[in-house]
Structures are given as structure tokens and as C-alpha cells.
């Protein structure tokens, strides 16, 4: 006779074992109709699953985050159902959920086209609208394998052979004639799966291994209702307009080409933004008392073996050989900074030492994962490493946190998600070391009044980390900043300092990055601003233009005055109508356009317009130079007249 405890503390007693759905029905028909699954003693379970012992139960509906994920997972199965009807020879691999949707990897002897996607989506909707029940059956391992062998599904058989114990009882989900295998839970009925959209097809290696066969990955999105789907598709349209690859080409910021995959060719305007970011971060390094260093981009394999990178990171490292020695191009800067620390005797009085570098790093990311500036193989980190005592951990992490928020606020990012990533399965160091490291970061977050999410097993192999994820104007999350605590690497590389008792101690090392990859951060802010960079970052801050040839000398004079004041200004003396010039430079997202006609020359002034179309009136040259200098110095986000 199980007693079921509900979220409000009330209890219901049943004479016999009872399913999640039956509990919902006992509460009310409306709740039963809305029930997708349940959370039994904190564990997600299917609506048909039986509860035979006293338990706590939360009903999961489409309004819950878990409910939406279950809908998406069930839509992946619905995709399998539909594609099997249209392409009976297709082999199904895996179909998990992802942010905002799902995908399914399939093996088909022809490339899927947009027309195929449209047909699959149409069949999915036809099937879903029949509102058929999804039937779950627990079977033996052998029965599951026999089922998929009979159905000609080699990838499902491989999953059973390699990932599931022979004593297990896998769950098979029956969608009418289609059968899939999954941990679940799934929706009880397809009435929950009416609002979806198939988006694209991409290549994906089976098990993510390039030695395996390339499969076709079908991506889709799914939502609880029509309104949510429409809003998401609208956000996607806006994201496409803001795509940094599209804007980067339109504004001539950079390009990438096949001969250098994942590596950036910076053009003048893009490199201007890059250097401005470096300059800005350097001012903060000085403010927070860092020293700037520069390490070599390549070091002997022996050093990387000592750090543990060779054993844990080799697949992502580029290597080369010379004079019978093997070298690795650095994927990160930390080992080089320890070498700098090791030069000369250090005392506890010298600590903390805060060492920063704009380090050029390379990682051999899979070609299929490369994406504009967001995922590259060569990148520059605004990296720093702090060498300190254990007693200094909390104060130093606090200083890093303040620096993170200080810098992000300059770019207008205020919605920042904080995550604490704990020890991964593949790691160096003992549990006692990891306990101290994780506790140190957690204490610093608590001391700074920050709420955070724990990401179990997501830390680096050498230490736990705090991650700072920016939420942008389209409600997307970008992980940028990190603060990592490392008790292991300094000891592996023989770093030490003389303690107060004259004994030798190993310093604690704090890894810190704020922008993360400068390349990626430029991609993020390009999309955040839609290319309308704030004045201090804009490659060209002002364009001075004439109306007729008679104003050419005056235009040059104004341009020189702006340039002499450190403002990035250009003149436009082309024989075009001024309206044409204004439109062109507006499309180029230039913050200010200065028009010089006969009236302006006579008054010794300039007429100023913004890229947003605002007419700011006339200013003397000196007035506008001073105003613009102050705006750039303040690194404000808004143009004149927008305050």
C-alpha cells in the first residue's frame, strides 16, 4: 500500500502499486490530461511506470523544463517513425535532446535534401495528429538485441553490445510499428508533440570518431505550444540577421578559407576591434595589478608529459618534429607561466603574483565543429595565472570575480549565469586535493553573494572551475569567463616559494580568463550589437564628407583634426550625392557622419548625423573633437543623443 507524498506535502494512500498516471488521475482529470511524466523520489519516470513503495512524486507537465525536454526527446522518436516510413532502408543511430531541440543521426545511402526534410516533417505531423499512444516495454537484453537484429538496426545492436550490461532490462518504446530504445521517459501520447520544425542536416561521425562512418544528423526544434515555436523561429530569423559571419563579410572584418581551416585572416577593420579589446583589457590588468608576460608558442613534448596534457589532451594538440625532438604547439598558456614563475627564488612576501598574457593558442578541433569565430583552431586568450598561498585563495578569486563583472558591464552584459564545474572522471590529483579546490571556489562564490549551478564532472582534468556564461539579447548563453583552481600543475612543474618558516611550499595556481578567446568574443559582440559597435570599438568612428568639390580642403582639415585627437576618422570626397554617401556609411555602421557644406565652412562648423538617422545639429570642430574624445574615453555604449 504505497503512500505518495505530493509537492505540497499532502499524501495519498493506495491499496495497490500505482502508476504515475493513476496518481495524476486520482488528483483530477485536468492534471491527468496534462501529465507527461513524473519525478519519483527525484528521478524522472514514465507516466506508465509503477510505484510500489512509499515515495515522493512530482507530476511533470509541458509547463516544466523537464516536460519540454521529454517532448523534444519524443519528437526525435517521432522523426525516426516518420523517416522509417519514407525511407525503409535507413539505419537509426542516436537521437538525443539538445538546447531548444533534438537531433537524430541516421545512416542512409543518399544525401538528404531540403525537399526530403520537408517530406519527413510533413509525415511527422501527420503521425502526431493521430494522437497515438506511446507504449513502453521492458525486455531482456537478448530480446532487445534480437528485436533490432530482426529490424536490421546495426547501430542499436552496437549500443547494446558496447554500452548496456547483459543483465539490464532495456526499455523499448513502441510508436505503432516503429520501435526505439531509450532510457526515457517519453510522452504517453503524441498529442504533446504537435509543435516542431526540422531545421537542417549536417554530417556527424558515428560515436564522434572520424575513423567511423559519417552519418547524417537531422536537427529539429520542438516546443510545448504553437506560440513558443513561433517565437523561437522568430528569434532564429533575428539570429540569422545578426550572424557574425554574415556581418563580418559585410563590414570587411575578417575572412577564413579552406587552406587554413579554423584560422582567421583579420582584415584592417576587424584587427582594429581586436586591438581595441586588447587595449581595454590591458587597462584593467594595470588596475588589478597584473604583470604582462609572453611565452613561447611551442615547447618540447617532455614538458607536456610532465603537466599531464600529453596524456589527457593529446588529441587536441598540434605537434611537429625538429632535430629528433617532438614539440607541441601550446593549446593553453599555463605551463609557460609556471616556467616564468620558476625563474628566480620566490618568497611568500612576493605572493600573490598575477601573470597575464594575450596567448596565441592552437587546438586541433574536429573540422565539423568549426564555426566562424565561435569555434576556431587558432585563438588568443586573455589568459592569466595567479600564484598564491592557500590563505589567499578566497581574496584572489574574489578579485577575479570583480574583474569579470567589471569588464562584462562595459559591454552591456548584465545577465550572467555562474556555474561551478566539479571533478571529471579523467583527472589528475587525489580526492583530498579536489575537495580543497572545489571547497575554495564554492566559498568564494558564497562570500560574493553569487548563486550558482553545479555542473558535476565538468571541471578540467587539473582542477575545478567557475564558468561565467553571458546571456545575450536573443536569450542565448555564451560561456566566456573561467576561474580555475589548480593544486596539481605547480607541483608537477616544481614550482615553489619560501614560506614564512623558511620551508619550501608549492603555490596554488588560479587560472583566469575573462573574454576567453578574443576571436570568439568578437563573434559574440558582433551578434550582440548586430555590427553596430559602440563608438570606442567601431573600426571607423567618423566619416567626414563634402557636398561639392569646393569643400574638399575643409573636409581634409576636419578629418586631420579628428585623427590628430586619436579618433579613427576618414574623409569621403567622392563625386556622389551626400545622401548616397550617408546611406553607404550608415550600412557600414559608422557611428558619426560629418557633412561639410558652404554654410558649415562659413561658420567653422560641421553638421553631425548618426548611423541611427539622428540629426545632432552643428558643432565647431573643437567642440565635436572634445565630445567624441570623451565618449571614446568613457567607452560608452550609446551614441550622442541616445542618452
Swiss-Prot record:
It is found in: Cytoplasm. Catalyzes the attachment of threonine to tRNA(Thr) in a two-step reaction: L-threonine is first activated by ATP to form Thr-AMP and then transferred to the acceptor end of tRNA(Thr). Also edits incorrectly charged L-seryl-tRNA(Thr). SMART domains: tRNA_SAD. Belongs to the class-II aminoacyl-tRNA synthetase family. Its cofactor is Zn(2+). One of its GO terms (cellular component) is cytosol. GO terms for molecular function: ATP binding; metal ion binding; threonine-tRNA ligase activity; tRNA binding. GO terms for biological process: threonyl-tRNA aminoacylation. The gene is thrS. This is Threonine--tRNA ligase. Zn(2+) binds at residues 334, 385, 511. It comes from Actinobacillus pleuropneumoniae serotype 3 (strain JL03). Its EC number is 6.1.1.3. Keywords: Aminoacyl-tRNA synthetase, ATP-binding, Cytoplasm, Ligase, Metal-binding, Nucleotide-binding, Protein biosynthesis, RNA-binding, tRNA-binding, Zinc. Residues 1-61 form the TGS domain. SUPFAM superfamilies: Class II aaRS ABD-related, Class II aaRS and biotin synthetases, TGS-like, ThrRS/AlaRS common domain. It comes from the Bacteria. InterPro entries: aa-tRNA-synt_IIb, aa-tRNA-synth_II, aa-tRNA-synth_II/BPL/LPL, Anticodon-bd, Anticodon-bd_dom_sf, Beta-grasp_dom_sf, TGS, TGS-like.
Amino acid at each position: 500500500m504505497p503512500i505518495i507524498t505530493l509537492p505540497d506535502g499532502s499524501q495519498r494512500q493506495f491499496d495497490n502499486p500505482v502508476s504515475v498516471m493513476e496518481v495524476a488521475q486520482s488528483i483530477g482529470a485536468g492534471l491527468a490530461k496534462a501529465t507527461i511524466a513524473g519525478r519519483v523520489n527525484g528521478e524522472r519516470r514514465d507516466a506508465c511506470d509503477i510505484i510500489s513503495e512509499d515515495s515522493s512524486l512530482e507530476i511533470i507537465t509541458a509547463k516544466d523544463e523537464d516536460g519540454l525536454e521529454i517532448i523534444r526527446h519524443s519528437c526525435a522518436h517521432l522523426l525516426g517513425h516518420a523517416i522509417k516510413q519514407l525511407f525503409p532502408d535507413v539505419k537509426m543511430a542516436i537521437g538525443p535532446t539538445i538546447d531548444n531541440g533534438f537531433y537524430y543521426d541516421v545512416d542512409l545511402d543518399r544525401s538528404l535534401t531540403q525537399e526530403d526534410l520537408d517530406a519527413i516533417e510533413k509525415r511527422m505531423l501527420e503521425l502526431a495528429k493521430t494522437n497515438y499512444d506511446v507504449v513502453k516495454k521492458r525486455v531482456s537484453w537478448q530480446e532487445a538485441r534480437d528485436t533490432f537484429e530482426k529490424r536490421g538496426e546495426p547501430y542499436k545492436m552496437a549500443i547494446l553490445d558496447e554500452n548496456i550490461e547483459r543483465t539490464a532490462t532495456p526499455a523499448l518504446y513502441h510508436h505503432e510499428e516503429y520501435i526505439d530504445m531509450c532510457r526515457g521517459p517519453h510522452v504517453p501520447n503524441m498529442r504533446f508533440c504537435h509543435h516542431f520544425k526540422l531545421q537542417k542536416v549536417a554530417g556527424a561521425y558515428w560515436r564522434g570518431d572520424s575513423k567511423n562512418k559519417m552519418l547524417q544528423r537531422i536537427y529539429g526544434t520542438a516546443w510545448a505550444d504553437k506560440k513558443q515555436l513561433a517565437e523561437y523561429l522568430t528569434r532564429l530569423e533575428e539570429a540569422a540577421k545578426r550572424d557574425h559571419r554574415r556581418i563580418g563579410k559585410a563590414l570587411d572584418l575578417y575572412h577564413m578559407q579552406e587552406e587554413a581551416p579554423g584560422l582567421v585572416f583579420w582584415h584592417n577593420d576587424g584587427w582594429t576591434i581586436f586591438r581595441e579589446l586588447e587595449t581595454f583589457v590591458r587597462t584593467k590588468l594595470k588596475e588589478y595589478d597584473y604583470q604582462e608576460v609572453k611565452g613561447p608558442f611551442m615547447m618540447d613534448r617532455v614538458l607536456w608529459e610532465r603537466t599531464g596534457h600529453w596524456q589527457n589532451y593529446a588529441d587536441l594538440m598540434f605537434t611537429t618534429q625538429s632535430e629528433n625532438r617532438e614539440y607541441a604547439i601550446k593549446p593553453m598558456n599555463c605551463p609557460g607561466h609556471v616556467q616564468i614563475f620558476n625563474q628566480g627564488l620566490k618568497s611568500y612576501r612576493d605572493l600573490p603574483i598575477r601573470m597575464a598574457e594575450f596567448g596565441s593558442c592552437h587546438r586541433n578541433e574536429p573540422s565539423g565543429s568549426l564555426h566562424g569565430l565561435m569555434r576556431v583552431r587558432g585563438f588568443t586568450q586573455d589568459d592569466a595565472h595567479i600564484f598564491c598561498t592557500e590563505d589567499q585563495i578566497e581574496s584572489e578569486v574574489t578579485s577575479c570575480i570583480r574583474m569579470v563583472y567589471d569588464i562584462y558591464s562595459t559591454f552591456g552584459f548584465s545577465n550572467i549565469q555562474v556555474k561551478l564545474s566539479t571533478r571529471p572522471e579523467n583527472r589528475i590529483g587525489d580526492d583530498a586535493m579536489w575537495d580543497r579546490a572545489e571547497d575554495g571556489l564554492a566559498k568564494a562564490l558564497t562570500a560574493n553573494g553569487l548563486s550558482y549551478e553545479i555542473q558535476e564532472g565538468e571541471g578540467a582534468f587539473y582542477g575545478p572551475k567557475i564558468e561565467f556564461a553571458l546571456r545575450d539579447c536573443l536569450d542565448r548563453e555564451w560561456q566566456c569567463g573561467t576561474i580555475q583552481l589548480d593544486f596539481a600543475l605547480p607541483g608537477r612543474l616544481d614550482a615553489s616559494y619560501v614560506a614564512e618558516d623558511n620551508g619550501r611550499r608549492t603555490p596554488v595556481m588560479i587560472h583566469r580568463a575573462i573574454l576567453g578567446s578574443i576571436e570568439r568574443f568578437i563573434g559574440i559582440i558582433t551578434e550582440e550589437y548586430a555590427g553596430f559597435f559602440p563608438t570606442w570599438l567601431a573600426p571607423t568612428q567618423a566619416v567626414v564628407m563634402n557636398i561639392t568639390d569646393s569643400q574638399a580642403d575643409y573636409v581634409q582639415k576636419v578629418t586631420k583634426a579628428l585623427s590628430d585627437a586619436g579618433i579613427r576618422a576618414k574623409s569621403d570626397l567622392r563625386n556622389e550625392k551626400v545622401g548616397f554617401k550617408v546611406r553607404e556609411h550608415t550600412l557600414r555602421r559608422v557611428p558619426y557622419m560629418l557633412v561639410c557644406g558652404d554654410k558649415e565652412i562659413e561658420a567653422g562648423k560641421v553638421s553631425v548625423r548618426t548611423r541611427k538617422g539622428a540629426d545632432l545639429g552643428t558643432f565647431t570642430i573643437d567642440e565635436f573633437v572634445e565630445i567624441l574624445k570623451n565618449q571614446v574615453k568613457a567607452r560608452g555604449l550609446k551614441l550622442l543623443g541616445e542618452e
